[in-house]
Amino acid sequence: MTSHWQELFEQQQSQEYYQHLQHFIASQRADNKTVYPPDDEVFTAFDLTPLSEVKVVILGQDPYHGPNQAHGLSFSVKKGIKPPPSLANIYKELTNDIEGFVTPEHGNLTSWAEQGVLLLNTVLTVEQGLAHSHAKSGWETFTDNVLLRLDQQPSPIIFVCWGNHAIKKGRLITASHHHVLNGPHPSPLSAYRGFFGCGHFSSINQLLIEQGNLAINWQV
């Protein structure tokens, strides 16, 4: 993990909420409950996207709760796993929004993370088969502090908030040089309420180019 993230992590690790959180997760694993993602992949987003290189943040909610899906990046799944419905809808929007985008057969978004897209869930662990089972355990405080740290970054960052949960979280971003893109969640329940046609991926690239940055290659 890069030094800037390491500094933030060390600050959090000294706080009581974080110690309670880690004890909760450790006790879950010790009770033979299956927790996703695996312990060594909980912080993949931070390992792949150094703080100084963050150009875009895509906020998710909590990890996928099926076997072999979650690997520490919001919306992403490991290769060999069928893209879940929300990711399939993200691909559908990309096909309409980005010229030449070809729908992949896999759902691994690592290449986005390596280009400066922080794929951040607001809760970083989940028990197998139980969506939102680790909500209110302390992760929300941790990721609030991540967003507050990102808000302090001098370089402009584009924050992408899909769905009410992410939109509420995105209100932590107040610095005027950042951009926040809000819209409906890509899940099948809400994608037709305005996620399809939102044009966020081309908007991100246009903003990046205006900032003098390279556009994201969304093809995976």
From Swiss-Prot:
HAMAP family: UDG. It is found in: Cytoplasm. Its EC number is 3.2.2.27. Belongs to the uracil-DNA glycosylase (UDG) superfamily. UNG family. Excises uracil residues from the DNA which can arise as a result of misincorporation of dUMP residues by DNA polymerase or due to deamination of cytosine. GO terms for biological process: base-excision repair, AP site formation via deaminated base removal. Keywords: Cytoplasm, DNA damage, DNA repair, Hydrolase. The keyword Hydrolase applies. GO terms for molecular function: uracil DNA N-glycosylase activity. This is Uracil-DNA glycosylase. It catalyses: Hydrolyzes single-stranded DNA or mismatched double-stranded DNA and polynucleotides, releasing free uracil. GO terms for cellular component: cytoplasm. Pfam families: UDG. It is an enzyme of class 3 (hydrolase). CDD domains: UDG-F1-like. The keyword Cytoplasm applies. The active site is at D62.
